[in-house]
Amino acid sequence: MSLPNPAELLPRMASDLRAHLAERGIERPRYVGIHTGGIWVAEALLKALGNEEPLGTLDVSFYRDDFTRNGLHPQVRPSALPFEIDGQHLVLVDDVLMSGRTIRAALNELFDYGRPASVTLVCLLDLNARELPIRPDVVGQTLSLGRDERVKLVGPAPLALERKVLSPAS
């Protein structure tokens, strides 16, 4: 199975997001990308939408429930939300939805900043491997991978997807 080209997924995602927001009567939502791939996808979506609003960024490293097992990422960055969260309609963007743990961590962090009116989840890929009941409202493509496979977004320009096969533990 070949991986999709993000540049081919993004125009449809932008159209689907526009329709999703209009259906709910949401105007001028605030956009938040999750480090790092989610920021790249959010920037591409904002460009496709012709939107020049500031982009908020989250690094959820300290909010992950598995960092004691996996360790802290060596490049923890500060989150930056250049707007109020309280009462805002947010569009939360990530590159790959797998277990749902990154999204759970992002929601926890967002609620530490305030109580949004709503959160719309947008993901470039849904790997259909959820451990938590989290589903994207807008998705570029859904894929099913083997247990030893992962997908990583590389970029920022051009955006591309790489498949990785995990090596067995020694």
From Swiss-Prot:
Domain of life (superkingdom): Bacteria
Motif extent (PRPP-binding): 90-102
Key words, A-Z: Glycosyltransferase, Transcription, Transcription regulation, Transferase
Gene Ontology MF: a single term: uracil phosphoribosyltransferase activity
One annotated GO biological process: regulation of DNA-templated transcription
SUPFAM superfamilies: PRTase-like (SSF53271)
Any matching Pfam family: Pribosyltran
EC class name: transferase
Entry's EC annotation: 2.4.2.9
Function: Regulates the transcription of the pyrimidine nucleotide (pyr) operon in response to exogenous pyrimidines.
Family indicated by similarity: Belongs to the purine/pyrimidine phosphoribosyltransferase family. PyrR subfamily.
Name of the featured protein: Bifunctional protein PyrR
